[in-house]
Amino acid sequence: MNKALFLCLVVLCAAVVFAAEDLQKAKHAPFKRAAPCFCSGKPGRGDLWILRGTCPGGYGYTSNCYKWPNICCYPH
């Protein structure tokens, strides 16, 4: 009985540790996987997305220019 209780306690502690670790990861925003780029006629710096036909959603991009085969996306 003591071994079974100890095993349950170990499993419970491990579950708490892994759950807390996942919550820590969820707090951080995902990194953009883009390089800096510039388009002629547009002020500021854009994000160069390699081998994409369109700008990805969820980053607030409002304009873009093509640098074949890549795309340079501009926020706001």
Curated annotation (Swiss-Prot):
Q: Where in the cell is it found?
A: Secreted; Nematocyst
Where does this protein chiefly localize? Answer: secreted
Q: List the disulfide bonds.
A: C37-C72, C39-C65, C55-C73
Q: Name one GO molecular function term.
A: toxin activity
Signal sequence extent: 1-19
Tissues of expression: Highly expressed in the ectodermal tissue from the distal and proximal tentacles, body wall, and oral disk.
Q: Please, one GO biological process term?
A: regulation of blood pressure
What Pfam families does UniProt report for this protein, alphabetically? Defensin_4 (PF07936)
InterPro entries per UniProt: BDS_K_chnl_tox, Myo_ane_neurotoxin_sf
Q: What is this protein called?
A: Kappa-actitoxin-Avd4a
**Organism encoding this protein:** Anemonia viridis (Snakelocks anemone)
Sorted alphabetically, the Gene Ontology cellular component annotations on this record are:
extracellular region; nematocyst
The record's comment on protein family reads: Belongs to the sea anemone type 3 (BDS) potassium channel toxin family.
Additional remarks: Is the most represented component of the BDS family in A.viridis.
Keyword terms, alphabetized? Cleavage on pair of basic residues, Disulfide bond, Hypotensive agent, Ion channel impairing toxin, Nematocyst, Neurotoxin, Potassium channel impairing toxin, Secreted, Signal, Toxin, Voltage-gated potassium channel impairing toxin
Q: Provide the residue ranges of the propeptide in this protein.
A: 20-31
What's its job? Acts as a gating modifier on both Kv and Nav ion channels, and also acts on blood pressure. Voltage-dependently inhibits voltage-gated potassium channels Kv3 (Kv3.1/KCNC1, Kv3.2/KCNC2 and Kv3.4/KCNC4) and slows inactivation of the voltage-gated sodium channel Nav1.7/SCN9A. Inhibits all Kv3.1, Kv3.2 and Kv3.4 by about 50% when tested at a voltage of +40 mV (45%, 48% and 56%, respectively). May act by binding residues in voltage-sensing domains S3b and S4 of Kv3.
